[in-house]
Regions:
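Extended hydrophobic/aromatic-rich secondary-structure runs
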Residues: 3-27, 242, 246-248, 253, ...
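Residue-level signature of catalytic and energy-coupling elements of molecular machines
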Residues: 1, 39, 165, 179
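Short secondary-structure junction motifs
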Residues: 5, 160-162
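FAD-binding core of FAD-dependent oxidoreductases
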Residues: 5-7, 39, 195-201
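Early-domain small/polar-rich strand-loop-helix modules and first-structured segments
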Residues: 11-86
């Protein structure tokens, strides 16, 4: 979650790719990560229209920015987080205002919300407070961000509650707990560089080279057909491997994956099907994937192969250490209560259904690995704000913060 939009993708042991996408009516045929984007970010504008709270898609952008940027901008999600107490003004640089030498202006945000609240109450006949109005917009923004997550999980036959929510972007930590709870997710992970991880991650990422050829084969189980497919796949694999060898990767650091773009005859929905490591039993993989995504199979239809694709992955690192979940599991219950809480300053923060609660503000650099922080709390550093809501517990690990979401009996 950044300033203008939120990007969502799903990872289940491997990256999910699409071969084409449509943006603003234009179809782009190019392999890319399957990423859904919605207009909900820190600068998404807030409106009250036809009796409804509306967030986006208009954006205040970086200039003029939200109202609190001191440039006459409109109300935005950042203003809602500010007036509800979720942002630590003192941590923001003094780069706002006409001369870009001032801090955030919470008073401007409050005045704008007071005017909007008066308008909403007059139109609806209700007596909402500024906090309730601001929280209402935050709730709408969270729901907007939940939709693409449901599209990538529930709409494809996967239970959202069985996933971990990994959050990135400067605004992600402010909404992570609320979104996880709305989706029934029990665990949230935020890397210590989550707000700048696009740059950090590129330095650590594996390098990938793909080659593909169109095909008009029918998967008919005959040795001749399989031999033709294998021969073409082997040739593509050599091309892909040679490319990474030329880029300096050792042969033992290159991993090859073979895919067939398969579909049922008479349909236009092809699925990229990964070849199993120890066989060419592609039909069963395709059928299982099709059933998972659509809930049925067309057992009386022939299976066509639209193209053959080989992906070569050059490993940048053998290992980056234990995963966050593995480190948390190894630590078990041996977390210590965070000592920094004893001296932390507090401020009243508004929480949905709870009202204003005294909430400690703790700098991440003051927390040691394998300490825990019960919610409510705000964890901050120079690049991010993590809101730990009530009935949530933040566990500090060596490279990340892992938040456990607690539910009532019978909930996920």
């Amino acid at each position: 979650m950044g300033g203008t939009s939120t990007d969502v993708s799903r990872y289940a042991g491997r990256y999910e790719h699409v071969m084409e996408t449509t943006l603003d009516g234009v179809t782009i045929q190019s392999p890319q990560l399957d990423v859904n984007t919605v207009a909900s970010g820190g600068s998404s504008c807030l409106f009250f229209r036809n009796g409804l709270f509306v967030v986006g898609p208009d954006s205040a952008s970086a200039h003029p920015g939200p109202t609190c940027y001191r440039k006459g901008g409109p109300l935005a999600i950042t203003d809602a987080n500010l007036v509800t107490g979720r942002l630590a003004i003192e941590m923001f640089p003094r780069i706002f205002g006409p001369n870009e030498n001032e801090g955030l202006d919470i008073h401007a945000s409050l005045q704008a919300f007071e005017a909007l609240t008066t308008h909403i109450n007059a139109e609806t006949g209700r007596t909402m407070s500024v906090d309730e109005v601001a929280q209402g917009f935050i709730r709408v923004a969270n729901e907007v961000m939940c939709r693409p997550i449901r599209s990538l999980t529930q709409a494809r036959g996967f239970s959202t509650s069985k996933h971990v929510l990994a959050c990135f972007g400067g605004a992600g930590g402010q909404h992570a707990c609320s979104i996880a709870r709305a989706l029934g997710i029990k665990t949230v992970v935020l890397h210590k560089y989550s707000s700048i991880l696009s740059a950090f991650g590129m330095a650590l990422a594996d390098r990938v080279f793909e080659v593909q050829e169109p095909s008009n084969e029918t998967w008919d189980h005959t040795p001749a057909t399989l031999e033709r497919i294998q021969t073409r796949a082997d040739a593509l694999a050599k091309r892909a491997q040679d490319e990474l060898l030329a880029q300096g990767f050792a042969r033992d650091r290159i991993h090859l994956e073979v895919y067939l773009h398969m579909r049922y005859d008479g349909t236009d929905t092809a699925l990229m099907t990964l070849k199993p490591a120890d066989s060419w039993n592609m039909e069963s993989v395709f059928v299982d994937t099709y059933r998972q995504e659509f809930g049925f199979v067309l057992s009386n239809r022939a299976i066509l192969i639209d193209d053959i694709r080989v992906r070569a992955v050059g490993r940048t690192f053998d290992s980056l250490g234990p995963s966050v979940l593995a480190e948390h599991a190894a630590q078990g219950t041996r977390y210590a209560h965070a000592k920094a809480l004893d001296t932390a300053s507090q401020r009243p923060v508004y929480f949905d259904g709870e009202g204003r609660l005294p909430t400690p503000i703790v700098r991440l650099k003051d927390l040691s690995a394998f300490e825990y922080v019960p919610g409510p709390a705000i964890l901050i550093d120079e690049t991010q704000t993590i809101l730990v809501e009530p009935r949530c517990i933040a566990h500090i690990l060596t490279q990340a913060v892992l938040i456990e979401i607690q539910y009532d009996e019978g909930r996920p």
